[in-house]
From Swiss-Prot:
EC number: 7.1.1.-
Reaction catalysed by this enzyme: a plastoquinone + NADH + (n+1) H(+)(in) = a plastoquinol + NAD(+) + n H(+)(out); a plastoquinone + NADPH + (n+1) H(+)(in) = a plastoquinol + NADP(+) + n H(+)(out)
Lineage of the species this protein comes from: Eukaryota, Viridiplantae, Streptophyta, Embryophyta, Tracheophyta
UniProt membrane topology term: Peripheral membrane protein
Name of the protein described by the UniProt record: NAD(P)H-quinone oxidoreductase subunit H, chloroplastic
Gene from which the chain derives: ndhH
Function according to Swiss-Prot or TrEMBL: NDH shuttles electrons from NAD(P)H:plastoquinone, via FMN and iron-sulfur (Fe-S) centers, to quinones in the photosynthetic chain and possibly in a chloroplast respiratory chain. The immediate electron acceptor for the enzyme in this species is believed to be plastoquinone. Couples the redox reaction to proton translocation, and thus conserves the redox energy in a proton gradient.
Amino acid sequence: MSRPVRRKDLMIVNIGPHHPSMHGVLRLIVTLDGEDVVDCQPILGYLHRGMEKIAENRAIIQYLPYVTRWDYLATMFTEAITVNGPEQLGNIQVPKRASYIRVIMLELSRIASHLLWLGPFMADIGAQTPFFYIFREREFVYDLFEAATGMRMMHNFFRIGGIAADLPYGWIDKCLDFCDYFLTEVVEYQKLITRNPIFLERVEGVGIIGGEEAINWSLSGPMLRASGIQWDLRKVDRYECYDEFEWEIQWQKQGDSLARYLVRLSEMTESIKIIQQALEGLPGGPYENLERRDFDKKLNSEMNSEWNNFDYRFISKKPSPTFELSKQELYVRVEAPKGELGIFLIGDQSGVPWRWKIRPPGFINLQILPELVKRMKLADIMTILGSIDIIMGEVDR
């Protein structure tokens, strides 16, 4: 007896672009066979603003306020990469004090970015409580940013040759207090999240990426280190003054969503270690000490005081707004919270770049999403997408 052949009906589902779990205006066209994902096609471009072309029509100092709109949750890194390129082209030396302050701000920005990844990631998989916890700690970071830069977000703090202003009175003590407090909160996160059996059920073994596969897809940041590859540009390139501090690359072997979570959680602890060392070893010490020593110098008429040393300044000689970019090519990169943030820069002996190519980590890391979600369940899409950590401002540029 012959049986009738049943036709296999596939369902096409649109997720986004206006969806709370999309982390921006991302649209996914998902093909389903029941609850199983057959195909996934990301649709990009909803937040494209022509950031590269804008850079090619602006002087660097004019373009700095724009770059904070790429990854608007880690704006210090976009500012850092924007000034690092011209500094290398012009052989501009950065005072040691300015470099230390840059590192402090970069690591605080890394913590803020990872915190705002953790909360929505937990909310995506059904845990609402950590979402409110992370905003409590993030407020402390933003208070430090506001005290030092005047802005909670979009800081516009980095300058070619240094930073815009020195640290204000009492800022170092306030930051040290935050470091001590935050380490206890990371332990609380581990108790609340890492040992939760429901959380482990949702993330363990979901979205596995092997080490060789991660390299072939050009993944970077926590996505790469969670797959067993110990690669961190702070150790590899040794930019700023990271080689003066003691810290370890955080990595995992499993390559799943749980491994990516563990890497980011551990990175926040390492960032605190770097910040504490930078604050304690800051050349010149707190600003009030520098001011007092400068006053003593005037009383004693010591014109060549060590406290007037180049390394104790917050910026070297300020270049003019029409600072010319020499005629050469250059690729610079930093280890941003989401991965390798790079700039390919071509100067043509004018005040504006001839070519300004952005290499955003989120755009590169997002490419592997269709491969990760195939043959998974519909509910796992949000878990995997959340573990990648994207911001559409830098994906679309």
